[in-house]
Amino acid sequence: MKSSKYPFNKIANLLLLLFISSICSAEYLDNLSIKKIIDGDTVHVFHQDETYKVRLIEIDAPERNQPYGRDSTNYLKFLLKEGKVDVEISGTDRYGRKLGRLYWKGRDINREMVTAGYAWVYDDYVTDRSFYENQSKARKLKKGLWKDSNSIPPWEWRKRKK
């Protein structure tokens, strides 16, 4: 009986170590200038003589040529019109973009894009399940892309366009 507890403790300790290392690996950069807003989930920011391409985590906004794509981009421009943000970087994607969460005056911009109905929760990559509550409210109130009951998530749109 005792031998069955040992593997569990080992696994639990390993999971705890992985969780702690993931928290510690996040990098927080403050007061960055917005250089360019590419679309509703990608921006270029400037920090210490270097420009970073940042992909907003937890969300997937409509593609530029997709219905609501321009609206999504314009809403992100509206949110970031004052041009300075804080970024919590949690990694790098396969395209070399920094994966991050944007904050403007303490406001979570990634979450705001979902709350306003200009981005979906990115099912395959979401780690903060509370984003689904924001999405449900936006859908119920028919905000942004939820005005169209046939809206297609970007990941499906991209598959269809291949």
Labelled PLM ranges:
Residues 2-18, 22-162:
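Small beta-barrel nucleic-acid-binding modules, primarily SNase/OB-fold domains
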